[in-house]
Every structure is written in C-alpha cells, then in structure tokens.
C-alpha cells in the first residue's frame, strides 16, 4: 500500500496530476471494486470523498427526504453525526434499544409501522464502547417497511461484516483497514439510484451522464490515497475477512475479560460483544487525559481519552478507550492491565 501511494505521488510530480490520474484509471476502478465487495454494493454506486464526515454531509445534501424530514437513531449515535442532522433540519426520532444498547428489532418494526422516520441511521460499530449493532437484521426490518437505512461504517469497515443490505454505507480509510488518511467512501445500493439522480440533475443540471458513484465523488481529490485505500481493501480481502473479524472480536473480548476486575475502573458495554473496542469508566476520580498521557509517554501504550461529545445521548462522563488490533498479544493486554492498576 505504501509503495502504491508513493508511486502515484511521484507520477503526479513528474507527469502532472491530471495525466497521473488518467493513468491510474485501472487502479481506481480496482479500488472501487474491492470496496464494493466489502460493502455489498455495486461498483458504480461507490464514491470517493475525503472522510466519513464528508460522506455523511454529501449524503444528507443529496438524499430526497421530502417535506418535514426526520431520521431514526439510537442513544449510542456518534455525536458529530447528530450535529450534522441538526444542521440540516432533520428531526431526531429515537429508536428503541435493549439494556445493552442493541436495537430492539421488534420495537423497530412497531416504530416503522406506526410513525416511520424518513430514514434510519445506525452507527454499526460504536466508537466509544463495545457495541456492534445487528445491522443485517436492522436492514431487513427497514427494507420490509420501505424505509432507507444509512450505515456509518467508519469503525466497521475491516472490523466486522459491512455487506448488510443497507441503502447507504459510508466509511473512512484510516481506521481498521489502516489505509491512508484523507480518504472516505460513500456507497449507495442500486435501488436508490433513480431518486438520487433526479436530485443531482436539479442540483447540477450541467453534470455529465456518469455513474452515481462518480457524481457523488469529490472532484478535487487525494488520488494517491484512493489508490492506497484500494490496496488496503484488497489486502483485507486476501487475508480472508471472516478470519480478521473473528480475531478482532476475540481480542476485544479478551481485553474486556482481563480488565473487568480492575480496581477503580469499570468496563463499559457488554464483555461478549464482537467489537475490538473497549471502554473503561473511571470510578475513583481519575483524569482520563492524564492517564492517556502517562500510558503513552511512559509505556508507549496508545489509548484514547473520550469525552461526552462522542455519544451525548448515552455517555455521562469521560472514559478511556482501548482499541487493540489483530497483532495485539496477551502480553500486551497484561501490560496494559498492570499499568492501569499501578496508580
């Protein structure tokens, strides 16, 4: 991946950006195809943008919501997404969940039958704690009710199965696929192409007759990063995604099992969840920013100090996030436990 990114950057420097991009048409098509496979979408529905944030903004700008638009969310929804909905005037409809925060499928069926929102939006893998939503089942409920499902797969792509049957999936390159920064992806199912094309024809009447993915893609772009994301996606496919997902789930469970008996810390979220992400709530007044700084500065252990803005409808105070990847060992986890228990 690094070689592909640097090779394209060198091509831009020696031949010019436009010529280099033309010469990279095959690599970009391959990237689109690999991502389409991971997301369960048609190649022509895959758009490249700068980030998951830009992807959501693009989606909200072009989706044909109609009058009095609303969007269904769960309490664990990512805070910046909620802000994006608010800026665009979408009324928030809170969807039912169980005690652990998973969508209550029967409750969702009732909501969609009685007072359906314009769309349902689900963050598939929560950023702030262990919580992987049953998105394939949610997609089935939404499809039966003819309500589009939007999926934020920023923490899901490369982490869990993202080919779920949703109307729209968007993600970023730089998380579990470990692709380049500055690249995101927005993918739309073909059933929704006609409605989007009608909106795009109004917004850009002079736009060329192109596939939906091309129309939604950012024009001024980090082409080398897109090529790098394609390489990362193909590497993931070559490893066998189910094996990667199973390994990440095992690492996450091992992390929570090891840390759940720590004094002065409480594991947030189900221990048996399939997420590799874990969160710890301080119970003795610890400053999570100071703990993060100590772990990194003294031991080289990377964690994240999380504040309430990440999930303002659910979080009640700061937490410490641990996000081990597939190469994390049991010794690494013991070292983290000992470091957290030492002060």
Regions found by a protein language model. Name each.
Residues 1-32:
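A glycine-/small-polar-enriched, mobile loop at the entrance of the PLP active site in fold-type I
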Residues 73-119:
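PLP-dependent aminotransferase-class I/II
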Residues 22-36, 41-69, 79-81:
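Conserved beta-loop-alpha segment that forms the PLP phosphate-binding cup at the N-terminus of a helix
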Residues 165-205:
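Active-site PLP attachment segment
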Residues 249-253, 262-299:
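Conserved PLP-binding catalytic core of the aspartate aminotransferase-like
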Residues 101-154, 158:
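Active-site phosphate-binding strand-loop segment of PLP-dependent enzymes
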Residues 4-6, 207-257:
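Structural motif of enzymes handling amino- and sulfur-group chemistry
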Residues 297-298, 308-343:
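PLP-dependent enzyme catalytic core of the Aspartate aminotransferase-like
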């Amino acid at each position: 991946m690094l070689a592909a990114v640097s090779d394209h950057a060198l091509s831009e420097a020696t031949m010019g950006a436009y010529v280099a991009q033309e010469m990279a048409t095959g690599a970009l098509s391959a990237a689109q195809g690999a991502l389409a496979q991971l997301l369960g979408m048609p190649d022509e529905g895959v758009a490249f943008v700068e980030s998951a944030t830009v992807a959501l903004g693009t989606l909200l700008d072009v989706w044909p919501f109609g009058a009095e638009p609303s969007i269904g969310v769960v309490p664990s929804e990512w805070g910046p997404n909620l802000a994006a909905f608010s800026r665009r005037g979408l009324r928030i409809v809170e969807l039912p969940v169980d005690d652990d925060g998973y969508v209550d499928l029967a409750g969702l069926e009732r909501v969609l039958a009685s007072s359906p929102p314009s769309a349902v939006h689900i963050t598939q893998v929560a950023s702030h704690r262990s919580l992987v939503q049953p998105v394939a089942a949610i997609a089935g409920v939404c499809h039966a009710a003819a309500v589009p499902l939007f999926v934020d797969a920023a923490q899901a792509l490369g982490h869990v199965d993202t080919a779920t049957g949703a109307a729209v999936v968007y993600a970023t390159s730089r998380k579990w696929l470990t692709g380049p920064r500055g690249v995101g992806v927005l993918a739309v199912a073909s059933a929704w192409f006609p409605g989007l094309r009608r909106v795009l024809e109004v917004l850009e009447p002079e736009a060329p007759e192109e596939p939906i993915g091309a129309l939604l893609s950012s024009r001024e772009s980090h082409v080398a990063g897109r090529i790098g994301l394609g390489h990362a996606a193909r590497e993931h496919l070559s490893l066998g995604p189910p094996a990667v997902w199973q390994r990440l789930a095992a690492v996450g469970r091992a992390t929570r099992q090891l840390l759940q008996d720590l004094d002065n810390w409480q594991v947030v979220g189900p221990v048996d969840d399939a997420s590799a992400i874990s969160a710890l709530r301080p119970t003795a007044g610890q400053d999570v920013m100071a703990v993060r700084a100590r772990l990194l500065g003294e031991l080289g252990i990377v964690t994240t100090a999380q504040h309430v803005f990440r999930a303002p409808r659910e979080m009640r105070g700061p937490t410490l996030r641990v996000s081990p990847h597939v190469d994390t060992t049991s010794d690494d986890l013991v070292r983290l436990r000992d470091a957290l228990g030492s002060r």
